[in-house]
Amino acid sequence: MTNPEVRLRTFQAENNIYTKGPLSLVIQFTRLVRERTFPLNPDDFQTSSKGQVAGLGGGNLKKILKEHGITQQLSAEGGRTSRGSMGLMIKYVDFLNEWNTEETVDFAVVEDFWAEQVREYFRNQPFILTADTSKTIGANLDELFEQARKRQRQNPGTQYLGTVLQHLVAANI
């Protein structure tokens, strides 16, 4: 019996699930299939045109993320229109089916894992310093500091503002 986090991290790495579209798909799809009986059939999750994964959408994604305390918008379309979503969905179905043959999949654990990956995605977004010549250097830096404060509020216990200030001081020395 393999640790669920190890399984999920392996699947994540093998399928490059680190960006908005793939993360949107897997967290919503996990919610979509948690009450289904195994084995899952990928054909059951395709739209009638076979071009998109059925059941995905921005509103649904927002609701799931909110339940996990995530208020930022990951994706307006919820991964529904992302290129590669269909292929990833099929791989995810195969992954879940294989896992289920070995042990019962705990979808609460799986969904929590993907929610944490979404948090990680937001934590890793770069800060943007604009060089707006109509503003003073101080005003431009204030915008950067506000980004750091906002990120710090979204991730309690972190010190983004202090880190940004340390980097600016070190860059000036």
Question: Where in the sequence are the language-model features?
Answer:
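Interfaces and regulatory segments of ATP-dependent nucleotide/adenylate/phosphodiester-chemistry enzymes
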Residues: 2-156
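Acidic-basic catalytic patches of nuclease active cores, encompassing PD-(D/E)XK
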Residues: 147-173
